[in-house]
Amino acid sequence: MRMEGENWVYEVRGIPDEFFQRSEGIPMTKREIRIISLSDLRIRPGMRVMDIGCGSGSMTVEISNIIGENGSVTGLDVSGEAADLTMRNCRNLCRFSNYRIVISDVYKYDSDEEFDAVFVGGGTARIHDLFERIERMVHHASRVVVNAIQIHTAYLSLEEMNTRGYSGVNITQVMVSNGMRTSEGYAMIARNPVFIISGDAP
């Protein structure tokens, strides 16, 4: 549990969920999923990263703190409320002013900027169209990581990566249970399983 006034000053990844401001109806990539997704994203200082469907901004914040002052992260969300929440969390938790938050539908987003890595935490309703957009954002060997809750989304993401010639394609299913204090001890409360799909763009 976060103590009032406590800041996250550690170098390890995975800021506890309670450090982030939340808003009802806006999803957040939970701590354990973030840790594995960040590992799969393979980012380093100086990289340019896109966070599609940034939601509460938990991944945007973590990415910002890894890539440092010479890197840049763009958080993209169709919801103005989500973009505002991401901005608030970035202001509170980012160590660098290397983030940019954009309100846009990913399918309409138009930019000439190339990214070294793309994380997809939302906006997965139209997977084929999504990968068409990603193809315009990346260069050879850019890293792409997709989080999915639905099996169908995971399957289609794998199909798109393999069809488009991605290398090192991998899928991991993560199932996490967290302890909840009860009158008699602790009970393990399960969260929804999440699929993490990753690969290198051709």
Swiss-Prot record:
It is an enzyme of class 2 (transferase). Keywords: Cobalamin biosynthesis, Methyltransferase, S-adenosyl-L-methionine, Transferase. Its EC number is 2.1.1.196. Pathway: Cofactor biosynthesis; adenosylcobalamin biosynthesis; cob(II)yrinate a,c-diamide from sirohydrochlorin (anaerobic route): step 8/10. GO terms for biological process: anaerobic cobalamin biosynthetic process; methylation. S-adenosyl-L-methionine binds at residues 29, 53-57, 77, 106. One of its GO terms (molecular function) is cobalt-precorrin-6B C5-methyltransferase activity. The keyword Mitochondrion does not apply. Signal peptide: none annotated. InterPro entries: CbiT, Cbl_synth_MTase_CbiT, Cobalamin_biosynth_MTase, Methyltranfer_dom, SAM-dependent_MTases_sf. HAMAP family: CbiT (MF_00786). Belongs to the methyltransferase superfamily. Archaeal-type CbiT family. This is Probable cobalt-precorrin-6B C(15)-methyltransferase (decarboxylating). The gene is cbiT.
